[in-house]
């Protein structure tokens, strides 16, 4: 089949709007992002006014393990606490839990940059997060003073840890693992196979751009 014969995908909904919102917690403003991303109707536009709408947490991450692979995590952040005030952050030894040979660095559970803490707040923070009841795990891949682990160990530890998970008695299956890696890396894609050949062979390259500072950046996807 020729690539030209493949029909264009039809979007479910298309919205435009100004995402420059404040993080005020007046009314329902703390959840404007969750509402904005799950509604086919553009509810906010350029307005920062409270629309009187609440975000219904039908799915809140209960029974799910979320892993942030980044610059680390601020351990004592109040956003990780559950409704009882207990932190959902699980400070495990990745080498011990995965069975991978190695030593976890000292000060592994720190974040001198802040990016990892920011990302997990979006993922699972109790105020602005999507999965506010999920368990939180952190792997420091980009750290300072030798507190990070290598790429190879990160992959091996994640696989080994997930494979070693016990059955969750609440569900009868292993807890799902969701891993977030919010960072960039540069490489070249081999152009020997043409884009048509790549797509028709069911192989995909996911290239995404975002979260840059400032307004002068041009994104190419």
Where are these regions (language model features)?
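Protease zymogen maturation seam
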Residues: 1-64, 78, 213
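Hydrophobic transmembrane signal anchors and adjacent membrane-proximal interface regions, especially
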Residues: 11-21, 87-92, 198-200, 205-217
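Subtilisin-like serine protease catalytic core
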Residues: 25, 29-30, 52-153, 169-178, ...
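Generic alpha-helical structural context detector
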Residues: 35, 121, 156-159
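Substrate-binding/access-modulating region of protease and related hydrolase catalytic domains
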Residues: 126, 142-221
């Amino acid at each position: 089949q020729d690539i030209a014969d493949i029909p264009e995908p039809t979007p479910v909904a298309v919205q435009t709007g100004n995402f420059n919102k404040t993080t005020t917690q007046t009314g329902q403003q703390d959840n404007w992002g969750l509402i904005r991303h799950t509604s086919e109707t553009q509810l906010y536009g350029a307005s920062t006014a409270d629309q009187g709408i609440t975000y219904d947490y039908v799915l809140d991450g209960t029974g799910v393990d979320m892993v942030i692979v980044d610059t680390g995590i601020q351990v004592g952040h109040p956003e990780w606490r559950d409704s009882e005030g207990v932190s959902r952050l699980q400070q495990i030894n990745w080498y011990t839990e995965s069975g991978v040979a190695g030593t976890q660095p000292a000060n592994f559970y720190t974040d001198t940059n802040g990016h990892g803490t920011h990302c997990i707040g979006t993922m699972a923070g109790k105020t602005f997060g999507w999965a506010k009841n999920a368990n939180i795990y952190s792997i420091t891949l980009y750290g300072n003073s030798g507190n990070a682990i290598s790429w190879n160990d990160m992959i091996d530890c994640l696989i080994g840890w997930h494979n070693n998970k016990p059955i969750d008695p609440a569900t009868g299956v292993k807890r799902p693992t969701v891993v977030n890696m919010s960072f960039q890396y540069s490489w070249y894609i081999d152009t020997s196979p043409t884009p048509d050949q790549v797509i028709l062979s069911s192989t995909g390259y996911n290239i995404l751009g975002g979260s840059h500072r400032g307004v002068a950046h041009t994104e190419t996807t």
